[in-house]
Amino acid sequence: MMLHIPQVLSKAKVAELRALIDAAPWVDGNETSGTQSALAKRNAQLPEGSPAATQAGEAILDALERNPLFVAAALPQVVFPPLFNRYAGGEAFGLHVDNSIRQSRDGRTRIRSDLSATLFLTEPEDYDGGVLVVEDTFGAHEVKLPAGDMILYPASSLHEVTPVTRGARVCSFFWIQSLVREDARRELLFQMDLAIQQLGARIGADAPELVSLTGGYHNLLRMWAEV
């Protein structure tokens, strides 16, 4: 399941984070690449664990905790500390799959990457190219979102970033270990959650039918969750 989550960050918050990270030193993006990814990756990245990356990452994590759409879709158990990349001057990231296990440089965080997330920090009209292309069984999906919006997709997906031919594309990217590792099960729970919310608005949260459906949701989550 791919999901566009709008306005994870306000425009003012995006501007605040951009001022912070733009003033910080950047390094070769391959510092965090696996062997195969390093062959396809050309970009710059904020050093993992740097003061700017840590401060900006904490702001993003705070925003995610308050975002009900993200919580419902991802069912997050652990969110990897957000990283930051920048593409400019023809830089790109060829077709690849993210590593199945991610470990932070300090060794404090080690997760199974169930979901990948890209949070856009540049307005789409400010750069050419830089399209995130995610492949699944239905084909290739092109993603280029407003600053502050985020795309969430299975980490098992083949994906790439096309060359940036004008301007610079700055994003945050990170991975999520979900309480429910299988994408199909997560999607079913997400659809049930949305239906419960919509029905609650129409018939009332205390309607017997809704109480029964909510119980079914939690029993499925109980059956599938890994904690």
Curated annotation (Swiss-Prot):
**What residues does 2-oxoglutarate bind to?**
R169
Is Transferase among the key words of this record? no
Which cofactors are reported in the record for this sequence?
Answer: Fe(2+); L-ascorbate
The domain of life is: Bacteria
- The reply on keyword Metal-binding is yes
Q: Which InterPro entries match?
A: Oxoglu/Fe-dep_dioxygenase_dom, PKHD_C, PKHD_hydroxylase, Pro_4_hyd_alph, Pro_4_hyd_alph_FE2OG_OXY
Residue positions binding Fe cation: H96, D98, H159
Known SMART domains for this protein?
Answer: P4Hc
Question: Which species?
Answer: Phenylobacterium zucineum (strain HLK1)
The terms under GO molecular function for this entry are: 2-oxoglutarate-dependent dioxygenase activity; iron ion binding; L-ascorbic acid binding
Boundaries of every Fe2OG dioxygenase domain copy: 78-178
Specify the protein name: PKHD-type hydroxylase PHZ_c0292
SUPFAM superfamilies assigned to the protein according to its UniProt record, in alphabetical order: Clavaminate synthase-like
UniProt-listed Enzyme Commission number(s): 1.14.11.-
Q: How is the cofactor bound?
A: Binds 1 Fe(2+) ion per subunit.
Give UniProt keywords alphabetically: Dioxygenase, Iron, Metal-binding, Oxidoreductase, Vitamin C
- GO BP, sorted A to Z: DNA damage response; intracellular iron ion homeostasis
